[in-house]
Amino acid sequence: MLFGRKMPSSEKFRDYVLAQFKGELRVTTRKMMGEYILYADGKIFGGIYDDRLLVKPVAAAKSMLPDAKLQLPYDGAKPMLRVTAEQIADKGLLARLLDAMLPELPAVKKKK
């Protein structure tokens, strides 16, 4: 464990998560310190941390994932909702989750 973290997320897991979103919405990633920030339509909706899919705990996500546990992506971060392996395997659920979350998410701020 380095600085209280496990090993970085694998590209294999990132590729699997992206494949589950493929064709539903435009989902992209940006690598940051061994992990992946997830964007949909230019908005950050979650990330891949230690090979876990975590999403922002907006009202729509809490409603659609009522049993999801809040977990920290890394030390000092705000808690996010953990999406289980079974939920990741359900492409329809992921598409509905993003459709519901996007209106609640702020646009990414442009750097000056």
Q: Could you tell me what each predicted segment is?
A:
Residues 1-112:
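Charge-dense, helix-prone N-terminal extensions
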